[in-house]
Amino acid sequence: MDRAVGRVALENEEREAKNTWRFVFRIAIFLLIVITLAISAAALVYSMEASTPGDLVGIPTVISRAEEKITSALSSNQDVVDRIYKQVALESPLALLNTESVIMNAITSLSYQINGAANNSGCGAPVHDPDYIGGIGKELIVDDASDVTSFYPSAFQEHLNFIPAPTTGSGCTRIPSFDISATHYCYTHNVILSGCRDHSHSHQYLALGVLRTSATGRVFFSTLRSINLDDNQNRKSCSVSATPLGCDMLCSKITETEEEDYSSVTPTSMVHGRLGFDGQYHEKDLDVITLFKDWVANYPGVGGGSFIDNRVWFPVYGGLKPNSPSDTAQEGRYVIYKRYNDTCPDEQDYQIRMAKSSYKPGRFGGKRVQQAILSIKVSTSLGEDPVLTVPPNTVTLMGPEGRVLTVGTSHFLYQRGSSYFSPALLYPMTVNNKTATLHSPYTFNAFTRPGSVPCQASARCPNSCVTGVYTDPYPLVFHRNHTLRGVFGTMLDDKQARLNPVSAVFDNISRSRITRVSSSSTKAAYTTSTCFKVVKTNKTYCLSIAEISNTLFGEFRIVPLLVEILKEDGV
């Protein structure tokens, strides 16, 4: 019993001792916390000099500024990401596609030649310098924002003249035609020995060449093959086109004046010729009796043709045989194009009557003067599978000289302003199954041509006339959706006379600052323009081949005028 009581007493003493030590430990911890807080408060007061709530008012502003800096940095990073995406997803694939296109064109050209070696088509395809890869036949300026007329031509640049000139006072070189492909260019003009008005005999100069860059970086045109067709065949109104087999050319063979030809009852003889890469020329007469059975006169459009879908497409115009199926199909058809902000004051019925009469000018005996497009299959056989397209006159004006051209994936037909409408016209053209379809044209109100009254440069009403001059525009500035914004060209800046050639960039209403060939009294005639880019330097150039009056050697000298396209700052 005593032992049990003693054990209980001992346990009570041990429990009291533990409780005492717990209490002492808690007091010690509490004192330590108080001392730590006191020291921390003292240190805080010392370091911040006892900041009050008023001192913290500016903190939200500081935080806001920090947020702005962070947001700006993130935005900058997003711009970088966007540029990287644009480069990787858009620009690089397009560049690769351009390069692929050039390579495929070159391979196609070589393939044609290899397959045609047995037919003397020649080997050794010429190719432009690598600096031009992806810069020929492309949309050169793609810009949705800048004013078209902020682009303008430089002063004319000295370069190698690749065009032969007359060597006597009675010599005449006229009617230049030019076309360039991804691999080579083609050029032709007519040579008359006894003055420009002789229709009975002439030569035809035809050349094939490539674009080169000199050691100092200058552009020049290098002629590799040329021929002077002096064989008693009077070729006229020739159009040339660069194709995978060389330089294809369409000409009429003339033995009478134009007025006499329109008075005849049979079509005009035509030939499809080719200057091959080996320097040999061959040609074949077309079966005009079948192909132009509804025509009394038919001529190539003078301007260059274009190689599209394994066919070469040439502009054609001439007179339809009265009451023939083609003539009957156009009866009553007409179109009226209007000047920008300059309405014709004539009554509508009178305008319609005059518009209809404009297709049958009195100069050609009232024959309907019609626009057409001729496509020919490009093969080692000349004149193969020709197909003639006659567009409706609800789209086209009276048939004049013209040009077919391709830029990027777009095709166009230029119509010379031989009728009442003075501003330059470019019709979008689509091709399908060997035929062409023309659509409502782009018009360039400030790109006019001189003409006789009542169809002078400022004319605004439909009338019957045969006037004007060939001055084609070249598509230069595009929207990103591939629609055309502006063109380059060399116009004759006079109301009635063939005077004052000037080069400029044109939108649908106005023009850029000009580059003048010489004085305003300088005589000139036909001009044909083509633009390209030196990809290595990213510089865009335009070539205007122009007939400029000559006072000593011949009536005209054909001059290749070269400019660089510049841009005004901040426009």
Curated annotation (Swiss-Prot):
Glycosylation sites: 119, 341, 433, 481, 508, 538
Subunit structure: Homotetramer; composed of disulfide-linked homodimers. Interacts with F protein trimer. Interacts with host CG-1B; this interaction inhibits viral adsorption and replication rather than internalization.
Organism: Newcastle disease virus (strain Italien/45) (NDV)
Annotated InterPro entries: Hemagglutn-neuramid, Hemagglutn/HN, Sialidase_sf
The protein's name in its UniProt record: Hemagglutinin-neuraminidase
Known catalytic reactions: Hydrolysis of alpha-(2->3)-, alpha-(2->6)-, alpha-(2->8)- glycosidic linkages of terminal sialic acid residues in oligosaccharides, glycoproteins, glycolipids, colominic acid and synthetic substrates
Residue intervals annotated with topology Virion surface: 48-571
Subcellular location per the Swiss-Prot or TrEMBL entry: Virion membrane; Host cell membrane
EC number per UniProt: 3.2.1.18
Domain of life: Viruses
MF (Gene Ontology): exo-alpha-sialidase activity; host cell surface receptor binding
Similarity section: Belongs to the paramyxoviruses hemagglutinin-neuraminidase family.
EC supergroup of this enzyme: hydrolase
